[in-house]
Each structure stands twice: as C-alpha cells, then as structure tokens.
C-alpha cells in the first residue's frame, strides 16, 4: 500500500486571548493553542484554514 503524504501547516500564537470573545478563544483551543509562543502543526485542510482565518490577527504562520 502506498502511503499518502499529508500537507501540514505550522502556526505560532502571537496574540493573547485575553479580552477576546468566546468564539475566538474556542478557535484557538481547537487549533491546540492556549499560551503565547506556543506552536502547533496541523493538517492543511479547508476547515483548519477557516479556523486560522478567524484568528489570523493572533497567529503567525511558521511554515
């Protein structure tokens, strides 16, 4: 069987969730982020891209 390589995107949290609404805090948690400077490597899917777009002002794309 051939294994398919999945594309990934690596993001770093650069903004604080303090004083953000609950939806943005939940989106950060869904991306696996909760503290400044944390990094998370995620599958590059349309749903993850949408989550990144919702909180793009709090994130930095590393790769």
Swiss-Prot record:
Keywords: Ribonucleoprotein, Ribosomal protein. One of its GO terms (cellular component) is large ribosomal subunit. The keyword Iron does not apply. InterPro entries: Ribo_uL30_ferredoxin-like_sf, Ribosomal_uL30_bac-type, Ribosomal_uL30_ferredoxin-like. GO terms for biological process: translation. Part of the 50S ribosomal subunit. HAMAP family: Ribosomal_uL30_B (MF_01371_B). Belongs to the universal ribosomal protein uL30 family. This is Large ribosomal subunit protein uL30. It comes from Caulobacter sp. (strain K31). The lineage of its organism: Bacteria, Pseudomonadati, Pseudomonadota, Alphaproteobacteria, Caulobacterales.
């Amino acid at each position: 069987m051939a294994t398919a390589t999945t594309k990934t995107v690596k993001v770093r949290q650069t903004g604080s969730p303090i004083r953000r609404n609950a939806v943005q805090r939940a989106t950060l948690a869904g991306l696996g982020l909760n503290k400044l400077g944390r990094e998370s490597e995620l599958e590059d899917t349309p749903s993850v891209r949408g989550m990144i777009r919702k909180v793009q002002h709090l994130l930095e794309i590393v790769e």
